[in-house]
Amino acid sequence: MVFYFTSNVISPPYTMYMGKDKYENEDLIKYGWPEDIWFHVDKLSSAHVYLRLQKDQTIEDIPKEVLLDCAQLVKANSIQGCKMNNINVVYTPWANLKKTADMDIGQIGFHRQKDVKTMTVEKVSKIVNRLEKTKDERFPDLAAEKEARDREERNEKKAQIQEIKRKEKEEMKKKKEMDELRSYSSLMKSENMSSNQDGNDSDDFM
């Protein structure tokens, strides 16, 4: 089971999601998307909350209101963190999550520590209450969704390559036509010059 939430403080809204327990967190880690940003309470046990961005967005593009929603949601889903104020929440792109065979279930590390950001949050109940009203329980096929996403990306890249090749072919055709036109113009000019010279020669014999 995966819990989905909607951050509708801005338009268009953003989708957040988290697993029910550490076992589902394993699947979320495995089948995350490059557009996902991972959130967790720093140095405490908590849910793994993911924010899904648009393809053209980066972690720097997250609106501060949405960032706060994610932080409040992950804080509220920490047994210790939910009782504390001014706790640190860490967040990083899904691609920066590192999972090795010797790690416990639900445990992760980072490929690059410099890509991990930290923010300090206080408890704001009204934000958590607003998010809870959007809560939706689903049983998604995460592997199938990831494959569909990757397939779409492959098709987009294929279409882009085909478009580039089409433009290159078109440019080559135009260049060839221009070269032929210049060659024809040069030939006509040469023939005209020869014709004029022939005319001058005939005048000399008169």
Curated annotation (Swiss-Prot):
Record has Ribonucleoprotein as a keyword: no
Membrane-crossing segments per the record: 115-131
Stretches the record annotates as Disordered: 139-206
Subcellular location: Cell membrane; Endomembrane system
Broad class of where this protein is predominantly found: membrane
Chain positions covered by the region annotation DNA-binding: 20-24
Subunit description: Interacts (via cytoplasmic region) with ILK.
Protein name in the entry: Coiled-coil domain-containing protein 25
Species for this entry: Xenopus tropicalis (Western clawed frog)
Chain's gene name: ccdc25
